[in-house]
Amino acid sequence: MKLSTIFTAFAATIATVAGYETTGSKQTVDILIDYIIKETPELSQNDVANWENGDTVTLQYVVNNNEESEITVVGVTGQFKNPVNNEIVTNLTTGKVGPIAVPPGEAIKFDQKINVDLIPANYELIPYVFIAQDSLIKVIPCRGQLATIVDAAVSFFDPRLIFLELVLLITFAGLIYVGYEIWGKQYFKGVASVKAKKVSAAKASSPVASGPSTTSATGYDTNWIPESHLKQKKTKKVN
């Protein structure tokens, strides 16, 4: 089988498949396809996988060809469905594989990477493998895998969070600087000038004594008292 014929048929099949289900009559094939999740190989079909948005999940497929003729694996895709109502939520990007020829009675392995980015909820992942056989492309569904998807917890040391914190800090510092330049300088200048005026007024109102002055034992200045009055006080004291 020529590779160009395989790829032409593969493209035509994708174009005519609605929801990855063939529009013609279903055919039975003796091709067994299973997979494991490399990150959690212990999970089975009955388990529920727990994934976070941003994770990369690797599916490792095993294709067993029990047909009498050779088959060729040419592509892989898949869907996330709502496990309650079976509605399709999103389709995975169709990926090219190989092509990898599988002779009768033999098996091959290949990987598919899936980037998890969905609204947090419960889903069922159903992969599909494209097989070329006898100039036809066959879409073979694999078992479903239940999964719970949640948002990843944000770490304090996450570079994106650190960058956001720096942006907020710089913005806050810039607002403070602008506020000081517009209102702060004028306010502090006004307060300083008022204090200077109060100090000058206090100095001007203080009396300044000129010339020598004497104080009596009574503790007040006697220069301004007439001498006759002072003599009278002294005479009274002698008596």
Swiss-Prot record:
Tell where it localizes: Endoplasmic reticulum membrane
Q: Name one Pfam family in it.
A: TRAP_alpha
Q: Where is the composition biased (Low complexity)?
A: 201-213
Keyword list (alphabetical) reads: Endoplasmic reticulum, Membrane, Signal, Transmembrane, Transmembrane helix
Segments passing through the bilayer = 162-182
| Keyword Manganese belongs to the record | no
For this chain, the family text in UniProt reads: Belongs to the IRC22 family.
Quote the protein name from its UniProt record.
Answer: Increased recombination centers protein 22-1
Protein source organism: Candida albicans (strain WO-1) (Yeast)
Q: What is the lineage of its organism?
A: Eukaryota, Fungi, Dikarya, Ascomycota, Saccharomycotina
